[in-house]
């Protein structure tokens, strides 16, 4: 299974990762980035994904990258 990074896990990024998890994608293979530690904790709890505030870290070991920023 491929590793996925979601850069910018706001509303659009959350919709994307939510769909991936609901479709059976392994949440441990998803890393999401957000500037807010509170938002990152919320995403970890809700979906079981990994989070970071470092975009470079997220893309470094990912096969697919979604850029979800304004």
Feature names for model-found ranges:
Residues 62-63:
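An anion/phosphate-binding loop that grips the pyrophosphate of nucleotide cofactors and donors
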Residues 68-69:
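Short, well-ordered coil/turn residues at beta-beta hairpins
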Residues 1-57:
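NAD(P)+-binding Rossmann beta1-loop-alpha1 motif at the extreme N-terminus of oxidoreductases
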């Amino acid at each position: 299974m491929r590793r996925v990074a979601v850069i910018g896990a706001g509303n659009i990024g959350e919709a994307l990762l939510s769909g991936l998890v609901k479709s059976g994608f392994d949440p441990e293979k998803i890393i999401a980035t957000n500037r807010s530690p509170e938002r990152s904790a919320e995403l970890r709890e809700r979906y079981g994904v990994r989070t970071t505030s470092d975009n470079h870290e997220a893309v470094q070991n990912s096969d697919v990258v979604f850029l979800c920023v304004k």
